[in-house]
Structure formats: structure tokens, C-alpha cells
């Protein structure tokens, strides 16, 4: 699970991850919950929660435990790839484009939750499975997300996407090792 901090709707992604004890892949330090020391006890910063995850405000202690047990930060792709294999991750979802791409690169089905125009445009162009943040607000359980995870359009368009990429590299005289041959997926 990935989530982009900020706003009530986006923080519902974090809530669903917490509900199902999903691994939380943190992709930038701004996503990492801030803590404060209160009389010798480390606690989550209420300021961080209100700004970044307001729908979790009444679950502060749950979030603190979830963060300790389930959050992961990767500094290199090899470690991230090993994590997917070691933890036997079966499904990824969230608002972070690159987090879902890394899951997909590792053979893990992923569902993008589009919360901005950039993510929507990228998922449209690549024909990736997605739901809008508004659609996500109606989701009650993880199984409902799986219903949206359809790769039919990506499979249909994969060759053309690859050809477009290789043509770009060739046209711009960028060295590559790609040699495309068309194989019908039908």
C-alpha cells in the first residue's frame, strides 16, 4: 500500500491499509509520520496527522503501531525487489505511481488510485488499472479493489507502448538493446 499525504480522502487509503495490515511502502520522507517526545513517551505528532492523514485522527495509537510494524522505506531497488519476494506480496494499491510500478515490475498486480491529473494521465496513457479517489471513497474492503484490477487494456496495448518507446529511443539516437517482434496475445 502506498499513500500520498494530505487531505481527508487520500488518508482513507492509509485507513484501508491499516484495516488489512498491509505493508506500507513510504516513498519520501514527508510521508513518514513525525513523532514527538511527551514526558519520555514517543507519540505521533498531532500536527503531522492533521496535515497529512486527517481521517486517521481518532486512531492515533493504531497508526503509531502500524507505522512501527508495517512501514518500509527502501533506498535502492534491489532491497525493494527482495522485499516483494520475501514478504510474498500478492496485491498492491495506492496513490503513489512509482510504488505501484515497482510492484508491477515484480509481478504483483497493482491498482492505482488516481488523486491528481498527473497520475490520471500516466495511468490512462499506459492503460493501467485505476480508480479515482472519489470511487475509492466508496470502497469498504480489499476484495472490492481487486474487482478494478483488470489488465485487459494494458495487454491489448502493450506492444504499441513498447514500440512507441523503442521508436523514441531510436529517433533520438539513444543506445538500446530492444528488438521488437510482434506476438499476438490472442
Q: Can you describe what each PLM-predicted range is?
A:
Residues 1-186:
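Active-site anion-handling motifs in enzyme catalytic cores
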Amino acid at each position: 500500500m502506498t499513500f500520498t499525504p494530505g487531505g481527508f480522502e487520500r488518508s482513507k487509503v492509509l485507513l484501508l491499509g491499516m484495516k488489512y495490515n498491509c505493508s506500507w511502502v513510504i516513498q519520501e520522507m514527508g510521508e513518514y509520520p513525525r513523532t514527538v517526545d511527551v514526558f519520555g513517551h514517543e507519540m505521533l505528532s498531532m500536527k503531522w496527522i492533521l496535515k497529512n492523514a486527517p481521517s486517521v485522527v481518532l486512531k492515533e495509537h493504531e497508526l503509531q503501531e502500524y507505522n512501527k510494524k508495517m512501514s518500509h522505506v527502501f533506498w535502492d531497488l534491489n532491497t525493494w525487489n527482495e522485499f516483494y519476494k520475501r514478504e510474498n506480496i500478492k496485491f498492491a494499491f495506492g496513490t503513489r505511481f512509482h510504488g505501484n510500478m515497482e510492484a508491477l515490475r515484480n509481478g504483483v498486480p497493482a491498482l492505482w488510485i488516481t488523486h491528481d491529473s498527473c497520475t490520471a494521465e500516466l495511468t490512462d496513457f499506459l492503460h493501467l488499472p485505476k480508480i479515482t479517489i472519489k470511487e475509492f471513497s466508496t470502497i469498504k474492503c480489499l476484495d472490492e479493489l481487486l474487482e478494478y484490477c483488470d489488465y485487459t487494456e494494458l495487454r491489448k496495448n502493450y506492444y504499441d507502448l513498447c514500440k512507441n518507446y523503442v521508436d523514441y529511443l531510436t529517433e533520438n539516437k539513444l543506445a538500446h538493446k530492444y528488438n521488437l517482434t510482434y506476438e499476438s496475445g490472442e
